[in-house]
Curated annotation (Swiss-Prot):
Assigned EC number: 3.1.-.-
Organism field: Streptococcus pyogenes serotype M6 (strain ATCC BAA-946 / MGAS10394)
Pfam families referenced in this protein's UniProt entry, alphabetically: ADDB_N, PDDEXK_1
UniProt protein name: ATP-dependent helicase/deoxyribonuclease subunit B
NCBIfam families in UniProt: rexB_recomb (TIGR02774)
Designated gene of the protein: rexB
């Protein structure tokens, strides 16, 4: 054993490479060992330092792969044991145990987190070279008994299934101990670089290598000043000193100091000395020199996105100066927080990168497909799960448009559950869904799923065969190939597919002869897929490397950017969570020699010092350390290590916001510039932050409130939301010349409510999602149908019998059967509707002097060449004197208000009067009115009645009255019926005024509509609040900001309101 240490200003790799070259020149085979996370980079660095740039005598590798380079005569290789396979083995072991067999863990047998913790514990035991029987001194002795039962049973299964229980290091160590490699190892030299500690497994292997190899050489960074210290607690070199001291004591050798030819910039050395002095309680009488500051930068940004963009711009600047991507390293303080953001931003700046972290498979479409398949079986064909399977792109041969159409129909018809999916689709709507096509698609989906899901409990091998057959039927493999759109995606899909097939193979091997339910089979495969990871090697070496900052080594790259160095992440506080606590691990370590658990929390301090030291020396030319004030949407403080650097004299530069400019850093990259052109042109709109905008918005609201109290008015802002006019070509297509524009009373109301709403509904023909579940529209259709049947029945049957017959026959109609007999909720709605019919029907029985002339009457009202008004009149009544009137059924309370009508928001009754006047060749004297009938079940507050008598009945019938517009000429005939004529009587001249103004409203609307310019102008009655449809999700209308765009209604005092509005109508309609 040879131990070497050196100062941070020298290159330990160069020193060790020289030792390796000497051994290789003497004919020895040299293994250059690096940590798992650094072997790829260390290999490139070692080969760069060799004069010949490559050699077969020096092999750069890891401890775990070292055994591959030795020839050992052994028995046939056993099955490989990975984490997913281990989890399946533990699941099978727990299946064979009863809850009462495990007093401590019996309730967690099927818990996936518990199984993951068992896998981690098993791996820890292997690394620590401990067995489950060594777990003494636990807080609860029952825990050890349970763990012994579980792990021993799992190991029995491993033996039965011919799995290799030993790790590669254990197998290698056993071969060395048996003397199988003595001849080969005697000609071997092992060089170890980059370690500051060994696991128990590595420590044991190292002792064997030291006894059998020609030489073992280990190096570490320690300053001469620190090496001579007797008290090292808190020293920045504490981890390395303990590492060297333990090896020196164990192998009875003294470490030697060495230097390299390569000496790094003095600025980094001086910073290291200041950092060391701060932590070893010594003092220095000098500070950093001015030119030292050129090699360090401390940045502070507002949030992560700005921080990454500043880094990207700086990288582009480095490329402009002649450097390569491979000269740059980006370190992340929090991988999870930055991983999703850094990729898109680097892509925008066209910076190729390699993220040194295995990617989880959880977001891949194949995993989403398997998860949806499992949930479809578990939750009995839930619609969302079936659709997610289709949307993954891996099920069958369906276009996106087909899937969208299928989704729209299943939502409309509320298709969910196996029963509904297995039956042909028969329900249709006004949109006329293509049922033949949808049923063909349904069969293509249901048949393979049904064949798979009907599988009963059987052997695991049989279940896998059926699953593979199902995957072939839906063309999973072919669809998987079609997902990739780039070479990188092809490589990712290949890695995911390989993991998927490995999981199926492991399941077949472990559970092949075990009886399982399909749900358990799919759940195990899903769990394995979601927890699996894959890694893709970059296609070129000239990329920016990105990795976690705690994996960095000194002198890694010329330029290093370390971002996200907040107090919460730098230093990192690691706390182990698992089946064993750190206290239990410590007690076990005390009684075991050369076998021990790794306790991360016990080494936080010295490991963090070592990481900070490596980070501060990671660059050879320039180091940038950055911290955001907001990370993961929470405020965080500066790292204590960065505060030390500030005390050393390094300035903290506030990078501020990423204001767009015409500097080289902003316009030097075409793709980044292209993505920011719009923002540059709108720079005046982003001068305030979101926080500033929110502040001034709240202030504006408060100011307006105070001004209203003082009866002052604040000038409203200019129009913020604007719309474009339709092109002439579109106008000609939508509103062709010579063809009248079709309008209804409802469409006219929508136009005067908000013009943009009319544009969406009647020009673009956008509709809300339909549903078979009864809503107010279907409830209205039901009530209309019952009363239509009732009023058509002219038999001599008692009224109650006719009412029962009308309800019965309406309920028997196929449409209403489908709607109201689908579930208990629909049946309850039907019962309420029947109560409403029974409560409202007596009003028809009371008015025996009324004769129903027609029902559900279609009309087309001609108002000139420009417009054709259409609609349906619910009922036309005739009084005893022959006068006609219109009845409109309503499921909610309605009454005619002349002010609302004047503003265009209630044209329905007057439009019906105009239609009736055109349908029947009568003059205005023979129209008695137009009215609403509120179909309701009246609710009365019995507390207001002293006793139950006729007043109670009168109150009920008082609520059931016709309300609307009535002719003053027919006053006497109306007095005997259930008509509310108070404040609702109009003379013939006044009725003519209403009819003429109604025509004016239509013509005015048509003139504006044909111009093709629709405003965002929901109406407001008071200028303070907006009552019209704002359509916020589409228009982004805000009442506080856009009140100037709202249409102000004309309102008049209640006194003489009718006369005043009629006067206005005459003026505007030119009467």
């Amino acid at each position: 054993m040879k131990l070497i240490y050196t100062e941070m200003s020298y290159s330990m790799t160069e020193i060790l490479v020289n030792e390796a070259r000497k051994a290789a020149d003497q004919g020895y085979r040299v293994f250059y060992i690096a940590p798992n996370s650094l072997s790829f980079e260390k290999e490139r660095e070692v080969l760069t330092l060799l004069p010949e740039r490559g050699t077969f005598s020096i092999i750069v590798t890891r401890f775990v792969q070292m055994s591959r380079y030795f020839t050992v005569e052994s028995s046939p290789s056993k099955q490989h044991l990975d984490d997913t396979t281990l989890a399946m083995i533990f699941y099978r072991a727990l299946m064979q145990l009863k809850p009462e067999d495990l007093p401590s863990y019996g309730r967690l047998q099927n818990n996936s987190v518990f199984i993951e913790q068992l896998v981690e514990l098993y791996k820890e035991l292997k690394n620590a070279q401990l067995s489950v029987h060594d777990l003494t001194g636990l807080d609860h002795p029952q825990k050890q008994e349970d763990l012994i039962k579980i792990i021993e049973l799992a190991e029995t299964i491993m033996i039965q299934q011919d799995y290799n229980q030993d790790s590669p290091l254990q197998s290698f160590a056993r071969a060395i101990k048996l003397g199988l490699l003595n001849n080969q190892l005697s000609k071997t030299v092992v060089v170890i670089d980059g370690f500051s500690r060994f696991s128990a497994e590595e420590d044991y292997l190292l002792s064997l290598l030291n006894n059998n190899c020609q030489e073992v050489i280990t190096g570490s960074y320690v300053s001469q000043k620190a090496y001579q210290k007797s008290f090292i607690k808190g020293n920045i070199y504490e981890a390395s000193l303990h590492f060297l001291q333990d090896l020196a004591q164990k192998y009875h050798i003294k470490p030697v100091f060495a230097t390299s030819n390569q000496v790094f910039k003095p600025a980094f050395s001086r910073l290291t000395q200041l950092f060391e002095a701060t932590h070893d309680f010594s003092q220095v009488d000098w500070q950093l020199q001015k030119n030292d500051l050129d090699h360090f930068s401390l940045w502070q940004c507002h949030h992560q996105k700005e921080e990454i963009e500043h880094v990207a711009k700086s990288i582009r600047q480095k490329l402009y100066e002649g450097y390569r991507y491979k000269d740059i390293l980006v370190l992340l303080g929090d991988m999870d927080a930055y991983q999703l953001q850094i990729g898109p931003i680097f892509d925008k700046f066209e910076i190729p990168y390699y993220l040194g972290k295995a990617e989880p498979m959880a977001a891949h479409p194949l995993v989403q497909f398997i998860e949806s398949l499992e949930r479809s079986q578990r939750y009995n064909w839930r619609r969302e799960d079936i659709l997610n399977m289709l949307k993954s792109g891996l099920f069958g041969c369906f276009d996106d448009s087909d899937i969208d159409r299928f989704e729209e129909y299943t939502q409309f018809a509320d298709i969910k559950g196996f029963t509904k999916f297995s039956k042909p689709f028969t329900i249709n709507s006004s949109r006329q869904y293509p049922l033949d096509f949808l049923n063909e698609m349904r069969q293509d989906i249901v048949l393979p799923l049904q064949e798979l899901f009907k599988s009963q409990k059987q052997l695991g091998a049989s279940l896998v065969d059926k699953l593979i057959l199902f995957l072939k039927k839906i063309r999973l493999a072919e669809n998987m190939q079609g997902l990739a759109q780039s070479q990188l995606e092809v490589e990712k899909n290949e890695e995911v597919w390989k993991r998927f097939t490995d999981i199926l193979t492991s399941f077949h091997h472990i559970f092949g002869q075990e009886k399982l339910r399909l749900s358990d089979c799919l759940a195990l495969i899903k769990t394995g897929m979601k927890s699996a990871q894959y890694r893709v090697v970059p296609a070129t070496l000239d990329v920016v490397t990105i990795k976690s900052y705690d994996l960095v080594q000194p002198h890694s790259k010329p330029f290093v950017y370390a971002i996200g160095l907040t107090q919460s992440h730098f230093p990192k506080q690691i706390h182990h969570s698992g089946l064993l606590s750190d206290q239990e691990r410590a007690r076990i370590n005390e009684i075991r020699n050369y076998r021990h658990f790794d306790i991360a929390s016990a080494e936080n301090s010295k490991k963090n010092h070592q990481t900070a030291l490596s980070l501060f020396n990671a660059a050879t030319k320039e180091l940038v350390l950055s911290v955001p004030t907001v990370i993961n949407e929470t405020f965080d403080d500066l790292s204590p290590y960065l505060k030390e650097l500030i005390n050393f004299g390094l300035p903290l530069l506030d990078k501020g916001k990423n204001y767009l400019s015409y500097d080289n850093s902003d316009i030097g990259n075409y793709k980044a510039l292209l993505s920011q052109i719009i923002a540059i042109n709108r720079q005046d709109l982003i001068e305030m932050s979101d926080q500033d905008k929110m502040f001034w918005t709240v202030v504006l609201r408060y100011l307006r409130k105070q001004l209203r109290k003082q009866q002052l008015e604040l000038p409203t802002s200019d129009y913020r939301l604007s719309t474009k006019s339709l092109s002439k070509e579109v106008i000609e297509v939508c509103f062709p010349k010579g063809i009248p524009l079709k309008l209804s009373a409802t469409a006219l109301t929508v136009f005067y409510n908000n013009q943009y709403n009319y544009f969406l509904k009647y020009v673009l023909n956008l509709n809300k999602t339909e549903s078979i579940h009864p809503d107010s529209r279907i409830h209205g259709q039901y009530l209309h149908r019952v009363f239509e049947r009732l009023m058509k029945d002219h038999t001599q049957e008692p009224f109650d019998n006719k009412l029962k017959q009308a309800i019965y026959h309406t309920n028997q109609e196929s449409f209403f059967q489908q709607v109201y007999q689908d579930n208990a909720e629909a049946e309850y709605s039907l019962a309420i509707l029947e109560d409403i019919v029974r409560s409202t029907a007596p009003i028809l029985q009371l008015n025996q002097n009324i004769k129903v002339i027609d029902q559900e009457k279609n009309f087309h009202l001609d108002m000139g060449n420009e417009i054709l008004v259409h609609g349906i009149i619910d009922r036309i009544d005739q009084l005893s004197d022959g006068s006609l009137g219109v009845v409109d059924y309503k499921s909610s309370a309605n009454q005619f208000d002349i002010g609302t009508f004047y503003n265009g928001l209630s044209p329905q009754l007057v439009t019906y009067l105009a239609a009736l006047k055109q349908i029947a060749p009568h003059d205005i004297n023979q129209l008695f009115g137009a009215m609403y009938l509120h179909l309701q079940d009246p609710k009365l507050d019995l507390v207001t009645f002293k006793q139950i008598d006729n007043t109670l009945v009168e109150s009920i019938y008082k609520a059931l009255t016709y309300k609307g517009i009535f002719s003053e000429v027919e006053k006497e005939h109306l007095s005997t019926g259930a008509y509310q004529t108070k404040n609702a009587l109009y003379s013939n001249d006044e009725l003519e005024t209403l009819l003429n103004y109604n025509k004016y409203l239509y013509l005015k609307a048509v003139k504006h509509i044909k111009k093709g310019h629709f405003l965002i102008n929901p109406y407001t009655s008071d200028g303070k609040t907006v009552q019209g449809d704002q359509l916020k999700a589409i228009t982004r209308f805000e009442a506080d900001l856009d009140m100037a765009q709202a249409r102000r209604l004309v309102t008049l005092p209640a006194k003489e309101k009718k006369e005043c509005f009629l006067t206005l109508m005459r003026k505007e309609s030119h009467l």
